[in-house]
Amino acid sequence: FIAQDFKTKKIITILNNRRQTTIRNYFFKYSKEARNRVKVVTVDMSGSYIPIIKILFPKAKIVLDHFHIVQHISRALSKTRIQIMKQFVKKSLEYRALKYYWKLIQKDSRKLSLNTFYSRTFRETITPRECLSKIFKLVPELKAYYDLYQLLLFHLQEKNAKYFFNLIQDE
């Protein structure tokens, strides 16, 4: 467990484990007034920290760590791709495209290369965008999930919280 100053990024302490009793015992060394001055606590997506944080820092906002949000939505797309992939015969073009080009499907679309490469799956020289286009023609149901994933990534990285949460609530 690492406690760090949000503004300065200075490490306050590194506890030897993540158990609630260890965390509670450490922070109860600080006065209630000092703990009430804490404004923000950033956590991973483990729900186990939230109850203890509310007790230790009653006035603090609890913020989910950016990395873990990206990891969570990335895993969701990956699981969806695998579920769709399993509907096809292993030797089919759809299965091979979904299996072989998983990294392209997961990649931030703004970071796709413009360079061409030879695709053994499609047996032609194409760009990553063209490859994705071919995959979505083969497996149109993946396109909606991909588009949502890309929108969530974009709004999260651009810190457009309003749009990010609207997308989550709409879907």
Annotate each PLM feature.
Residues H66-T80:
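RNase H-like two-metal-ion nuclease catalytic core shared by retroviral integrases
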Residues F6-K10, I14-N16, T21-N25, K29-K61, ...:
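Acidic/histidine-rich catalytic cores and adjacent linkers
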